[in-house]
Amino acid sequence: ADGGISNGSVSLAPRKSELYTTPPQEPTDSWLEHLCVHEFRHVIQFDKVNQGLTKGLSYLFGEIFPIAVFGVYLPMWFVEGDAVTFETSVGHLGRGRSPEFLNEMKAQIVEKGLYSFHKAVLGSNKDYVPNRYNMGYYMVSNTRHHYGSDIWSKAIERSGRRPYGINPFDKSLTLSIGNRRDSLWNTSSFRALFHNPDSVKKANYFYNTKRMLYRDNYSELQQIWKREAANCTHTFDTVPTHNKYYTNYYYPTALGKDTVLAYKMGLQETGSFVMLTHGKEKRITRTGLLYDYKFATDRKRIVWSEYRSHLRWEQAGKMRISSYDIKRKKYTRLRGRNNQFSPFKAGDKWGYVETDRQNRSYLVLTDSTLKHELWRMEAEDNEQFIHPSYHNGKILTVVQAPAGIRLESIDITTHNREKITQDIYYELDNPQPTDTNIIYRASYNGNNALYSLQNGTHKKILDSKFGLRFPSFDSEENRLYFSFYTSDGYKPGTATPQQLTSEAVDYTTYPLADEMAKQEQWQQTFTYDSVFPTRCYNKLTHLVNLHSWAPIYASLSPMEVDLGATIYSQNKLSTLTFTAGYVRQSGYKHGNWLLNLTYSGWWPILSVEFESGREDFQSFADGLNLQTGQKDALYVFNKSQRSSADFVIQFPFNLSSRQYNSSLRPYLRYQIEGIHHQRPKQVYGYELQENTAILYPVQKQDYHIYQANRYYQLMEYGLTYSNQTRMTEQEINPRWGQMLTGGFT
């Protein structure tokens, strides 16, 4: 998919991978290679599970059984932590070498201590808890560091080979560790981390090995990180903010004397631009979804890039340059066919990065109204422009290339490109040119720090315990603004030139990542030496993809499980899904045939639900006595079929914009249900004597019984409309919303 989202996923039922190929504005390895390596690791995990008894039972249940074992036994922090470890160990960068990724756990552990294992795994709406990727990376890699590279592989294999018992995954960890935990805690270097190592070891012990590893790993890392934090002595000023819960302030930028503009997002804020003045905060406007928080301003207007949903297709939305006139309070959005990122001010013009469907990257300049394109430059093959800025007729930008990441200066008039730094496998972004130097963020020292480049010499000028980013230099005040990370989020900071240092650059490695690379013994090198045949994808011939079958029927809507025999199909594009079979379903005493089918490949969504089964019922009927020629009243026990069909056509429209999630869904529904193929099993004569019903047996072959087929039809027209504000982590209900439903039956 070439929409505005940069992501990927792998599923096992059905077995497929989905890659969202638009590269993000993050300096990392080549996006497609990074994405494929991470997602392919999940494929390997699935294959590791699908062996032994699990593989045997997959012949009985199809692909649904391995994914059930996978979901029940493998914790998600391991699944994602292992994939992050692999992407880091075989890549040049990866998240295991990204301070932005690493510092979330560091800040929480150092400043707030260790949360309980359950809180770390399940998360919290009260406190910010780093996600399963962050927590899982340290769990997987640090455990491998102490207990060997195969400890997790054995756990997956045991879960697949023996998917019985309470927890084979945890049992395998227990067997793999054995007495080695005692050996680890007896080493002098490990004991030296703690004041009383024996008491810590005892407190960390749990019968659940995963829980024990969590305590051991993070107790060790806590001591290491505390010492690292104590060695950071840089000082700077903070811009006062007041928040009870976790809140981030991105890209603080001077908006006049004593006024700072920043993008705010947190547990109680979905995303908005705010002005900070003397400790007071004023919201300017809320925004839609931002995946990169970089914005630009000329102090009259704010320009940023936000996600614009497609009217119909979920993955076809684009990143669009949007602007807000502060004085007129007017919101506008730039149109275009491609994704637009990282706006910047270029004199009296505006600029941004554009990425097309082939992942070609462009620098674009427009006039002051953002309506007319004036200048465009295309990057070389496999290059991406990241976080450009402008100074004195030149665009300064980060360039991500296969050989590494570098800074470049591009002359607007001549289109001449000049390398300012050599290609290097460290993160670089947000270059801010001044009259005398270039200030940028880099990960040279294993942390997010600010550096200065002047006359070809790099110097570290500012650092903090858990990193700082998003520099912005105000030439009028001669002051540097930035965001520094804490366990309560990114906070705005500021420094004068006198507070900045001038330290030599220390190119630090990442010990844990390097150790994992040694264990893998493979460096990511892609050689394009083969050409594989391609052919057009035929949607018709690939419409059906049977992936699972089972002697049970399981439905999520409504939630029910019944015995039976069913097959499940979902094609690779997820346009056609259906479940078919014969099940012992509620409402049918003798079982019934069913078919639930949905086709989503066109704008309208077509749904069909069909059920048919035996229906026994009793009824009064008139019968012609073939011997006497009289019409008699009868009471009949019938054997018949009850069938129902429900056809629905929906026309979904996604009207979401800015801070509102909105949808409109007109629909047409036709339903028919009836009782047919009625056959009398037993027939009784019927008489009333003194208000008492008397039934007496008769021979059904003596009567011609009049019974019409029983059925009803329903035609329904209607629409549903929903509109509500996006919700924060802590909100139970939206701040504002409407739900309207109307129809005619």
Please place each PLM-identified region on the residue numbering.
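Juxtacatalytic substrate-recognition/specificity segment
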Residues: A1-V69, P75
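Transmembrane beta-strand segments of outer-membrane beta-barrel domains in Gram-negative
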Residues: E609-T745
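A short beta-strand motif characteristic of beta-propeller blades
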Residues: F236-K244, K280-R286, K329-R335, H372-E378, ...
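A flexible loop/linker signature enriched in serine peptidases of the S9 family
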Residues: G96, E100, Y246-T247, K264-F273, ...
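Short coil/turn segments that connect the beta-strands within blades of beta-propeller domains
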Residues: K257-D258, K300, G347-K349, N392-G393, ...
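Beta/coil-rich, acidic/histidine-enriched accessory regions frequently appended to metallopeptidases
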Residues: D127-P130, K154-Y293, R299
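Outer-membrane beta-barrel initiation region
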Residues: H234, T238, N243-T247, A442, ...
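Active-site-proximal alpha-helical
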Residues: F70-E100, K106-G178
